[in-house]
Design a protein with these regions (language model features):
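A gly/proline- and charged-residue-enriched helix-loop-helix capping module
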Residues: 90-127, 132
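Glycine-rich, proline-tolerant flexible connector loops at the mouths of alpha/beta enzymes
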Residues: 69-89, 97-99, 105-111, 194-213, ...
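Intrinsic-disorder/low-complexity, polar/charged segments
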Residues: 41, 48, 97-101, 156, ...
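N-terminal basic, low-complexity leaders that serve as flexible interaction/assembly modules and, when applicable
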Residues: 1-87, 326-339
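Active-site loop segments of alpha/beta catalytic cores
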Residues: 114-339
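Generic secondary-structure transition motif, activating predominantly at the C-termini of alpha-helices
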Residues: 9-13, 33-40, 108, 164, ...
């Protein structure tokens, strides 16, 4: 386990720490914009291995990050299960809402079997990625369920909230299905070459504590337990965004190797609260990266100084903003390397 990221995930306080960024492949890179123009349909782009491989590798070539994360989308799995999915400019993903037992029963099982193009991408990246570790990923079952029930991202998620409170049995049946499908999807990525896998629960912060434990922590812990049995040497990371006061409990109970943390949390303080050895990943504010200059330098140094001597992966609290100058990302890479 010589790759820096994998050593940190194994509990080693690697220094300087490994660094990669959420959305490190994306619209802030001119080479990505040029590539993206070749396939305007986003699902087609993600499921064309030649394009997805290139998108995955672009930030590795430019910045020599310690990890490459598969270029894909958290909604590819429900799409492969039969959900309608379209990406509209200015709106993001739009799906046909799933709000009754008949809609859940209409899903086709074994969605991972229809995502062979994603596995081709994983295998091809693994052959070319060099010293960077390759991270596969999926959406957390709760976050995927949010999109399926609501049909799109909404400010207050009214349909989702009504369903999970008024018909919890139905909502849990959807979560159970997504949990099973996610295990199979991540296992397929591992078998194709992923060296670590990550769950993105972008909407975990919507829930009160009791439902967070039931609908976020529970499914993640179940996925973690299954993966530890089938692939014990492959670490799992999880990003329960905006979980805040529940992060220490999540780290203790989810069984993951690392918890990724958003920018609203004092990362060194969280590290002191942990009851079990878990690597922490994060959590520079993406707006500090966008600003560059003194803001970037100061915030990066505060984070690095606070996490020295701990298992730590330097990342952002969320994805790279599209307007971020690539020169700022290059400077951040230098700051971490010089820590």
């Amino acid at each position: 386990m010589s790759k820096k990221l994998l050593r940190a995930l194994g509990g080693e306080a690697v220094w300087p720490p490994p660094v990669w960024l959420m959305r490190q492949a994306g619209r802030y890179l001119p080479e990505y914009r040029e590539l993206r123009a070749k396939a305007p349909d986003f699902v087609a782009f993600c499921t064309t291995p030649q394009l997805a491989v290139e998108a995955t590798l672009q930030p590795i070539r430019r910045f020599a990050f310690d990890a490459a994360i598969l270029f894909a989308d958290i909604l590819l799995l429900p799409w492969a299960m039969g959900a309608s999915l379209a990406y509209r400019e200015g709106e993001g993903p739009v799906l046909s809402p799933v709000r009754d037992a008949e809609a859940i029963a209409a899903f086709r099982p074994r969605g991972a079997e229809r995502l062979g193009a994603v596995m081709e991408t994983v295998a091809a990246v693994k052959r070319q990625v060099g010293e960077a570790a390759l991270i596969g990923f999926a959406g957390g079952p709760f976050t995927v369920a949010c999109y399926l029930v609501e049909g799109r991202a909404e400010r207050d998620w009214p349909a989702l909230r009504r369903l999970l409170w008024e018909d919890p049995a139905l909502f849990e049946s959807l979560l159970d299905l997504l949990t099973e499908e996610t295990v199979s999807y991540l296992e397929a990525q591992i078998e194709a070459g992923a060296e670590a896998v990550m769950l993105f629960d972008s909407w975990a912060g919507l829930l009160p504590a009791s439902r967070f434990r039931r609908y976020v922590l529970g499914p993640v812990a179940a996925i973690s337990a299954r993966l530890r049995r089938s692939h014990p040497d492959v670490p799992l990371l999880a990003f329960p965004r905006a979980a805040n006061a529940l992060l220490a409990e999540f780290a203790a109970g989810a069984g993951v190797a690392a918890v990724s943390v958003d920018s609203g949390v004092d990362l060194p303080a969280l590290a002191r609260q942990l009851s079990r050895p878990v690597a922490l990943q994060g959590n520079l504010d993406p707006w500090a990266l966008l600003a560059g200059g003194t803001a970037l330098e100061d915030e990066a140094k505060i984070l690095l100084e606070g996490m020295r001597g701990r298992p730590f992966i330097f990342n952002l609290g969320h994805g790279v903003l599209p307007a971020t100058p690539p020169a700022h990302v290059a400077r951040l890479r230098e700051l971490v390397a010089a820590a």
